[in-house]
Amino acid sequence: MGKSVVILGAQWGDEGKGKIVDLLTDRVKYVVRYQGGHNAGHTLIINGEKTVLRLIPSGMLHPNVTCLIGNGVVVSPEALMKEMGELESRGIKVRERLLISEACPLILPYHVAMDHAREAALGKKAIGTTGRGIGPAYEDKVARRGLRVGDLFNKEAFAEKLKNILEYYNFQLVNYYKVEPVDYQKTLDDVMAIADVITGMVADITTILDTARKNGEHILFEGAQGTMLDIDHGTYPYVTSSNTTAGGVATGSGFGPRNLDYVLGIIKAYCTRVGGGPFTTELFDDVGAEIARKGNEFGAVTGRPRRCGWFDAVAIRRAIQLNSISGFCMTKLDVLDGFDEVKICVAYKMPNGEIVEYAPLAAKDWEGVEPIYETLPGWKENTFRITDVNKLPQNCINYIKRIEEVTGVPIDILSTGPDRVETMILRDPFAA
């Protein structure tokens, strides 16, 4: 009997989802992206070779897997072709194994221009977007003015729609933001040059998934970003523009929610965050700097340094509620090697003195929040590349067990290094 498994970030993104998707892809027929765009940065290291995938599902490195991009994903034709080219230069037959929903909104140059113009205008109050046009493309979708993949089939109608929407954007860019307009003809020519390649990969994603389920095939849904960046449930307004939680699978792919069997939440052994927004356990001392150094905490897409802090069980409890998480995969356990002590945030003290065990929603409600920590003995032994849980230091095992206790969710997979083989699967999501 086939299983449908969701892999998603349970923190603020950058948890190591790409490696785990790649690891579990050996078991599946389909890997599906259902939200986000090329603002994702899924880093895979296989046999020492590094690959960063931003838009194409991580399953593309497995020749027997078909990769699907669902309607909830915003697609940059330029970014897609660039990524396809990189993979095809390595002999990977992308066009034979990548299928795209015709309902995917397109990201075009005016979205990118608007993204940059807005962030520049906000100055120090900027959200900290990746500047790739993701937000403006989702805005167009909701406003029902956006161009979609399906529009590429009718080139004349596309050209007319593009002209109208570009007038709307250029008016704002020139008159309000005082920046250069986006050139209509160049935008049209660039898209038309690759339109046939993209339309050649269009398919009915919902029917493919439903048929696969009925045929007993394993399906893996690959989330991007993280739970606390969800447009509705994250630390608004410091969030991304899509639903990063498990509910996004149904809306972003057309796969019925009752058909999901297991939700795997990816967590780091500590916490990180990129860009602005609240981060209760953030460390500003030498410990935080050491975690960042050992964890190589720089964004795969932006290259920006990540903010680092202790494990936040309060935020994780909210993620468990939102996603109905079945089990965790803990990554970067080895980064905590060598510390005299490690800490887990088990509650927040609110400005009014109230003690809470679940994170607030809006960013403004995090102001003045203080972390309440449990301190555990650290471990000096090296856990890097250990693949037998019985060989982990006892204090490390105690740390893992305590996180399971304070969250109420089992840790089913442990990662002790960037390569796919540096992993311990304690309970297989496809066998659970």
UniProtKB/Swiss-Prot annotation:
Substrate binds at A300, V301, T302, G303, R304, P305, R306. It is an enzyme of class 6 (ligase). IMP binds at D14, E15, G16, K17, N39, A40, G41, H42, T130, R144, Q225, T240, R304. It catalyses: IMP + L-aspartate + GTP = N(6)-(1,2-dicarboxyethyl)-AMP + GDP + phosphate + 2 H(+). CDD domains: AdSS. One of its GO terms (cellular component) is cytoplasm. GTP binds at residues 13-19, 41-43, 306, 332-334, 415-417. Binds 1 Mg(2+) ion per subunit. Belongs to the adenylosuccinate synthetase family. Plays an important role in the de novo pathway of purine nucleotide biosynthesis. Catalyzes the first committed step in the biosynthesis of AMP from IMP. This is Adenylosuccinate synthetase. It comes from Haemophilus influenzae (strain 86-028NP).
